[in-house]
Amino acid sequence: RNLLTWAMRLGGGPAIVPVALAAVLGVLTVRLSNDAALRPLRSALLSSVLLFAAGGVIGVFIHGSNVRIPAHYHGSIVGVTLALMGAVYRILPALGYQAPQGRMATLQPWLYGMGQLMHIIGLVWSGGYGVQRKVAGTDQVLRSTAEVAGMGLMGLGGLIAIIGGLLFVVVVLRAMRQPQAVSH
């Protein structure tokens, strides 16, 4: 068990930092070109790195069994999910569909990511007050306004993330409705 924890800390932390920095530096360099077709990809990558980093940082501060634990893995998993959303945006043209474009395609990863960031901040906040994981409703025994506010932020963030997830489906379906323009 200790070996697994050690491997997670080494592989999930220091090993990822150089890759994340390279990705962010690459995006910032590409940003100078201001190519509208790259905006949705840039949004997905930056929000992915942000959420994955938040999940990693939260993992460092886990003590005991409370809702900080699901905050950690929600951040990490959502970071990967956002990267996969960006990958879908990238491969659609290779499959013969239009590349997702426009404001909705650019804002969708940020909406999903910011909703999830609110979700995990609410969990970390409540976890700081000792709110237990794997319990719901009255069993949570939310004793203070701060605990209720943290869980409320978690719920609001979750709702925003659901809307962002549904927008991902809308963006992809719109791109798939129109075949890719053939260049001669």
Can you describe what each PLM-predicted range is?
Residues 8-18, 73-81:
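Alpha-helical transmembrane segments
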Residues 52-57, 115-121:
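Aromatic-anchored segments of alpha-helical transmembrane domains
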Residues 83, 119, 161:
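Short, electropositive, low-hydrophobicity segments enriched in small/polar residues
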